[in-house]
C-alpha cells in the first residue's frame, strides 16, 4: 500500500515494488489534488493490464476518481474489460467509525457503477470488515457483520433497480486476519460459501453470454466473493516489536491457505512509526516467500478434505449465519449501525479480549508470554489515526 504524498515519488516507489515481484498495488490518494495530470504521473509506465490497481480517497470524491481513471485507461488504449482493481467506496464504514452518515449511498453507488461500467472487473462497493477485526471483533462477528454489510448493498441497490448480478460483481470484501491460524483459514472458506448463498437468493441473471451461466439463466460468477485480506493491527505490539513478524507471517499463511484473492502484510513497526524501506521490504518478502518458495498460490483449496478445518468451517459458518440473521431481523446492517448494535457488540468483544490478554487467557507472545522486562519504550509512541483523505 502506498500513501501518495507526491504522485511522482509514489510512481517511482510503485515501479520499484513491481520489479520486486508484487502484482497488486494500492494507492491512497489525496482528493484535493485529483486531476488528469495527477493520475498520469502516478500511473506512468505501470502496465494496468499486468497488475491489479486499487485506489482509495475521500468518499465524496470517489466518482471523480473513477472518471479520471476511465479517461486515463482509454487514453492509453487499454482493453478495459481485462483491467482488474478497485476503488474503496464504503458508505457504512464511515458510519461505523464516525457514527454519522455522509452523502447518499444509493446515489453515489449508482454513479460509481455507471462510471465504471466499462471496467467490469473493477470493484467499487467495499465491505471493510477489516475495521471490525482491528477493533477486536471475534472471527464469527467479523464474518457475520461482513455478510450483513454486503447484503445491505445488495438489498438497497436492487431496490433501486440495479440488476443483482451487476451489484454483486461490484462488491469487494476487505477482511482482517487475526492470529488464530486454523480459524482464519476456516473463516475465509465459510465466507465464500455463505456469500454465494446470499447472492443466489437474489436470482442474479446473466446480462450477456457467460461461461458460468446456470441452467435457469442465473449468473454463477456473480456469487463469487472477491476477497482482500490484511494482517490485523489489533495484536501488533509496541514492545518486542520484531515478534510482530511472527504474527504477520502466520496470518499471511492462513489467508493464503484460505484462498484470498490478494493480501497486504502490515509492516511490523506500523503501530509506532511510519514504516521505512526495511520494514516494508520485510512485509513484502513475507508474501513472496509464500508464493515463490512455498507455492501457496498453486493449489485452489489446500485445506479441502481436512477433517479439522472442514469442521471448523461449518462451525464458524453457523455462528456467523446466526449473527447475520440477527442483524437482518433488526432491519439490516444500516438499521443496526444507526441503532449502535454493531458498535456495542464489537466494543464488548474489545473489552473482553483486552481483559483476556491482561489475565493471560489470550496469549500475546512477547507481551504477556515471554516478555522482555528490560526493554524500554524509548521514543516509541502509538501512531494516531489520520483522515482517509490523507490529511
Tell what function each PLM region has.
Residues 1-180, 184, 210, 256, ...:
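Catalytic alpha/beta active-site cores
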Residues 55-58, 101-113, 241-244, 320-337:
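Phosphate/diphosphate-binding loops
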Residues 80, 159-170, 201-224, 262, ...:
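Flexible, glycine/charged-enriched surface loops at secondary-structure junctions
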Residues 120-155, 249-304, 308-320:
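Mobile "lid/hinge" segments at catalytic clefts and subdomain interfaces of large enzymes
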Residues 137-143, 178-190, 232-245, 273-283, ...:
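Short glycine/threonine-rich loop-to-helix capping motif typified by GTGT followed
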Residues 151, 155-159, 169-177, 189-239:
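Accessory "access/gating" subregions that flank catalytic or transport cores
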Residues 261, 319-391:
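Intrinsic disorder at enzyme termini
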Amino acid at each position: 500500500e502506498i500513501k501518495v504524498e507526491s504522485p511522482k515519488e509514489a510512481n517511482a516507489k510503485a515501479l520499484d515494488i513491481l520489479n520486486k515481484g508484487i502484482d497488486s498495488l494500492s494507492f491512497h490518494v489525496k482528493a484535493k489534488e485529483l486531476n488528469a495530470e495527477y493520475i498520469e504521473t502516478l500511473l506512468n509506465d505501470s502496465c494496468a493490464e499486468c497488475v491489479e490497481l486499487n485506489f482509495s480517497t475521500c468518499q465524496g470524491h470517489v466518482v471523480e476518481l473513477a472518471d479520471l481513471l476511465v479517461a486515463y485507461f482509454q487514453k492509453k488504449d487499454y482493453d478495459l474489460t481485462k483491467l482488474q482493481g478497485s476503488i474503496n467506496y464504503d458508505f457504512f464504514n464511515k458510519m461505523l467509525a464516525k457514527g454519522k452518515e455522509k452523502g447518499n449511498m444509493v446515489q453515489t453507488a449508482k454513479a460509481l457503477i455507471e462510471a465504471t461500467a466499462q471496467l467490469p472487473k473493477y470493484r467499487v462497493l467495499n465491505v471493510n470488515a477489516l475495521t471490525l477485526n482491528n477493533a477486536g471483533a471475534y472471527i464469527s462477528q467479523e464474518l457475520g457483520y461482513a455478510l450483513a454489510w454486503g447484503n445491505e448493498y445488495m438489498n438497497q441497490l436492487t431496490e433501486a433497480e440495479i440488476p443483482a448480478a451487476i451489484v454483486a460483481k461490484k462488491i469487494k470484501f476487505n477482511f482482517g486476519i487475526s492470529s488464530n491460524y486454523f480459524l482464519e483459514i476456516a473463516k475465509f472458506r465459510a465466507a465464500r460459501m455463505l456469500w454465494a448463498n446470499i447472492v443466489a437468493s437474489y436470482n442474479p441473471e446473466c446480462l450477456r453470454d457467460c461461461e458460468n451461466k446456470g441452467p435457469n439463466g442465473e449468473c454463477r460468477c456473480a456469487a463469487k466473493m472477491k476477497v482482500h485480506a490484511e494482517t490485523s493491527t489489533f495484536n501488533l505490539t509496541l514492545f518486542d516489536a520484531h515478534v510482530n513478524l511472527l504474527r504477520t507471517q502466520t496470518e499471511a499463511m492462513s489467508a493464503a491457505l484460505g484462498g484470498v484473492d490478494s493480501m497486504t502484510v502490515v509492516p511490523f513497526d506500523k503501530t509506532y512509526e511510519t514504516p521505512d524501506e526495511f520494514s516494508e521490504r520485510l512485509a513484502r518478502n513475507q508474501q513472496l516467500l509464500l508464493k515463490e518458495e512455498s507455492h501457496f498460490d498453486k493449489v485452489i483449496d489446500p485445506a479441502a478434505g481436512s477433517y479439522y478445518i472442514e469442521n471448523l468451517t461449518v462451525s464458524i459458518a453457523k455462528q456467523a449465519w446466526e449473527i447475520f440473521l440477527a442483524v437482518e431481523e433488526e432491519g439490516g446492517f444500516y438499521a443496526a449501525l444507526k441503532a449502535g448494535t454493531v458498535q456495542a457488540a464489537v466494543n464488548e468483544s474489545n473489552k473482553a479480549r483486552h481483559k483476556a490478554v491482561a489475565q493471560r487467557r489470550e496469549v500475546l507472545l512477547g507481551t504477556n508470554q515471554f516478555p522482555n522486562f528490560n526493554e524500554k519504550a524509548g521514543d516509541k509512541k502509538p501512531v494516531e489515526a489520520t483522515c482517509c483523505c490523507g490529511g
